[in-house]
Amino acid sequence: MSEHEIHAGDSLSSTQVQEETPETAEERDQRIRKAGRRRRLFTILPPVLLVLGILVLLYPVIATYQNNLEQQRIAKAFSAEQTNLGPDVLKDELARADEYNRQAAEAPILDPWLESQRPNTPQYSNCLSQLDVNPVMATVKVPSADISLPIYHGTETSTLEKGVGHLFGTALPVGGEGTHTVLTGHSGLGSATMFDHLNRVKVGDVFYIEVLDRHLKYKVTDIRTVLPNETESLNKVAGKDLATLITCTPYGINTHRLLVTGERVPMDDQQVAAESAKVEPAVIQTWMIAVVVGIIAVLIATAVLWGFARKNRKKREAEEAAAEVSAASGNGEGA
């Protein structure tokens, strides 16, 4: 055998000895500590991620519930506050609004979501000065769509995030022959219900508008879906008292506008007020319940899976510990 072959054999034997050398106690402790850190990480991380996921899912539920509750509180407070104004103030404010509707010049009616609907003009300022004894102009209730919301001046983004907006260029919502008021509401907001259910309304349904101490009832006569620039149906009609509720559609896409138009039903104010008072929309929506039920189901499933995983982990750790003890015993006997 050559000298080169002998050295190669010695090198191979040395490598095999190194590979077969058992780990020291210090190395074993380091390995165990690293494994423990990994186990703790994988034990803590899933619950943290689960809690974060639940909070993300619960946010729209909680936000929508609070906003719905607040909007209904404002609508109810509006009715109660009218008694504090006094009959003369109420009469004067309504007379001014009626006169405004009679004198308002015909103007092009534009889509509520256009930026040009926020004009800096004397005409717009005059409109804002009407029915301004309260921050809320009026309220609207739609029983078949589960709607009870305050109405504000204008259709600015900030306005439509807290309630319904009166579309500038249309009559104030005080009723009157030859008037047509247009009320705008969002649908698809992640933090409020607003006009989400306006598509439930059918011809023949009714809705109510309360403005100061005047109560108006409208019966739905027309429902249509149009493009944003198709506003002809929002014009006044001689001899008719009309109100249109408008929102974006389809849900979440918003390429069109849903128009729900009603004609005023001649009724005594007290009768309308009594009917309107019965409208009590649900603050909690069906989808909220579905989300909460889904979260509970996920929690139960997670608890079951975590229990199985924990049981298997303990079994595996016990087997590893037994194997280490056995290996240590074997090394001791070999020594």
Predicted regions and their residues:
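N-terminal Lys/Arg-rich, disordered targeting/topogenic segments
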Residues: 1-38, 316-335
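C-terminal single-pass membrane-anchor helix
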Residues: 276-335
